[in-house]
Every structure is written in C-alpha cells, then in structure tokens.
Design a protein with these regions (language model features):
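Short beta-strand element of the conserved SAM-dependent methyltransferase core
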Residues: 35, 138-143
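Short, structured beta-strand-loop surface elements
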Residues: 65-124, 130-134, 142-144
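Short hydrophobic/aromatic beta-strand or adjacent loop that forms the aromatic wall/cage
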Residues: 32, 134-137
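Short beta-strand segments
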Residues: 29-66
Length: 144
C-alpha cells in the first residue's frame, strides 16, 4: 500500500523517521514504526507513526490516544481491515513487511504487554489514569 494521507503532525514524524532511518525519532527514540492501514470509510492507505515494543517476533502497539476518552481512529481502521504494511527499525537499518493486526482480548495478556510498553514509554501509565476506558493493546504479527 502506498500511503496517501497523514495528519500534519504525523507527516512531520514520518518525514523525520525516513530521514533518520527510524532511529532517534522525536522524543520516542528508536521505538517508532510506521503502520499503513486502510481507512475504514475511505479505503485509502493511511500511514501512522506509532511507538512499538517487541514480544518475540510480534510488534506491540498501544491505542492510547494520549488517554483521551475515545480510541484513536487507526484502531477502528484495523478492526475494519486488519492487514497492514509496517516499516520498522532493524539491525540493518529499516525493514518493511506485511502484518496482521490482532487485538489482545485476554486481560492478563493485555496487562502483561501494556506493562512492557510502559517500560518503553512511561507516559502510557499516565494515559491509563486519565481515561475510564481500557486502553487497547494490539499485536502486529508478521505475515509469512
């Protein structure tokens, strides 16, 4: 999918990510990936930079929206169409691959992964306190 749409804030981060080959991006450092998903309404590819962690071969992302009362739009897009393209930092620069998004439904597993992500981005713990919703955790599983 070739991305055709991003917010101005996201575009700045995307441009920086490409210029730095995924390293030292903004305040997030080396933990930013670019996920391209189809818009649920438009069907157009939309690229979103996201903080990520790893769990084995899987990439963990968190639908925090800064602790807002609603989920980010990209989560709705994934629920509509879970097949995505991912660009991520790798040992040899960056890598691109296709993945499937899996919502973590098991509460204990979600809590384990969320705790792992707060070690990478401590603000997630604050975001969780700001909202009444359970912040969703998503695994991006590489398609083979």
């Amino acid at each position: 999918m070739k991305p055709v749409k991003a917010t101005a804030w996201n575009q700045k981060t995307i441009d920086e990510w490409h210029a730095k080959k995924g390293r030292g991006v903004g305040m997030w450092g080396d933990h930013v990936l670019l996920m391209t998903a189809r818009g649920a309404k438009s069907g157009e590819p939309i690229v979103t930079p996201l903080v990520f962690g790893r769990d084995g071969d899987d990439y963990i992302i968190v639908a925090s929206k800064g602790g807002a009362p609603s989920n980010p739009q990209w989560l709705n897009n994934l629920r509509h169409s879970p097949e995505v393209d991912v660009e991520a930092p790798s040992d040899n620069g960056t890598e691109s691959f296709k993945a499937s998004a899996h919502m973590v439904g098991d509460r204990a597993e979600r809590d384990r992964l969320f705790k792992h992500m707060t070690a990478i981005w401590p603000s997630y713990a604050d975001y969780e306190k700001r909202t009444d919703r359970l912040i969703p955790v998503v695994l991006l599983k590489r398609r083979r």
